[in-house]
């Protein structure tokens, strides 16, 4: 009698139901594809929990990617996406659920509402079984694809809540002073909540008007995580090089920047851009040349920083080394190799003069 009395008493003082469900290695693993739906028993579990209680429910989902949640998400009061957190995952999740840690994670992907909404849906299945798939989405994957289609998503790229709130204000864009940076973007982030926490400020760039190629509405170009105490404010600064405005031109075998207007937006996710400024790039820049770029002129084509790249046909009278933004990084004379000391990670194009002929090559510092 006392046991049952205690049990029912305990049941009625529960503040929150924590429902843990999702996938494991039996339903989601390398070497196979799972369905977008939850495993049937897992969906049955969360459905029963929802039907049996009016107590607030917090869902904890273990999965390596998005799942169909239209049938149950509206009944949850909170959702913690655990991914696969490892052997200490229980400790980490407990600290988040009980408020010892203020979460600040952001989604690295977009969570669609339906699998058919995904930009890669039409190229995922080999419907005619000819072992040939057309990747028709091109660069319009993830949030770029949803911007293009206008589909409403479940949770956008870069989304994530915490136990506090933040505000962005006072955005400015001004010329930058530096070797590579051309613009400096500054905004002010304030913790407007009651607990300390971190926020990830995200910066997106979008070309306005026409371009030689079809381009996304916006693209993530920079982000910073900032930790603030309650009521604290901090200036958040981004430096943008020409890379932030460039695209690869196949005809020119180089990254180029179109002249014209661009929107620079900052916010907390791909769908929560709170501040925006328009800038104008007045002239095209970058390595624009009608000379064919042949990587075989330089060997090896991929090197560690500090190693040398050999010029395959011997000594050249002159070699100019540029990064992909068109910034000159080195002038070399009467040389048969390109030293990479002082070069950062990335691709470089070399303009060489051989017997009064101009030849280009390229290499990568990894």
What are these regions (language model features)?
Residues 1, 7-302, 325:
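C-terminal non-catalytic regions of proteins with extracellular/luminal or membrane-system context
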Residues 285-366:
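C-terminal outer-membrane/trafficking sorting elements
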């Amino acid at each position: 009698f006392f046991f049952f009395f205690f049990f029912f008493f305990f049941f009625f003082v529960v503040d929150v139901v924590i429902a843990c469900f999702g996938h494991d290695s039996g339903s989601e693993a390398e070497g196979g594809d799972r369905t977008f739906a939850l495993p049937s028993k897992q969906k049955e579990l969360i459905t029963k929990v929802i039907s049996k209680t009016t107590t607030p429910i917090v869902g904890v989902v273990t999965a390596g990617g998005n799942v169909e949640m239209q049938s149950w998400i509206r009944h949850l009061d909170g959702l913690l996406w655990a991914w696969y957190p490892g052997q200490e995952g229980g400790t980490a999740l407990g600290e988040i659920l009980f408020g010892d840690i203020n979460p600040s994670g952001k989604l690295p992907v977009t969570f669609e509402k339906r699998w058919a909404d995904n930009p890669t849906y039409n190229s995922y299945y080999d419907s005619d079984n000819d072992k040939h798939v057309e990747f028709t989405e091109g660069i319009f994957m993830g949030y770029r694809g949803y911007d293009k289609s206008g589909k409403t998503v479940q949770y956008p790229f870069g989304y994530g809540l915490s136990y506090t709130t933040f505000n962005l204000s006072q955005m400015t864009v001004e010329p930058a002073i530096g070797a590579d940076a051309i613009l400096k973007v500054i905004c002010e982030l304030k913790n407007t909540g009651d607990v300390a926490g971190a926020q990830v400020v995200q910066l997106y760039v979008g070309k306005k008007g026409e371009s030689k190629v079809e381009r996304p509405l916006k693209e993530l170009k920079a982000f910073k995580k900032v930790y603030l105490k309650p009521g604290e404010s901090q200036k958040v600064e981004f430096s943008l090089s020409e890379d932030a405005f460039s695209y690869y031109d196949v005809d020119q075998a180089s990254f180029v920047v179109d002249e014209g207007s661009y929107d620079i937006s900052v916010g907390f996710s791909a769908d929560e851009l709170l501040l925006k400024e328009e800038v104008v790039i007045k002239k095209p820049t970058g390595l624009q040349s009608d000379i064919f770029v042949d990587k075989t002129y330089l060997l090896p084509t991929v090197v560690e920083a500090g190693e040398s790249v050999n010029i395959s046909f011997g000594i050249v009278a002159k070699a100019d080394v540029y990064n992909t933004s068109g910034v000159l990084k080195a002038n070399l004379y009467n040389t048969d190799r390109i030293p990479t000391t002082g070069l950062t990670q990335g691709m470089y194009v070399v303009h060489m003069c051989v017997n009064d002929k101009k030849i280009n090559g390229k290499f990568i510092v990894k």
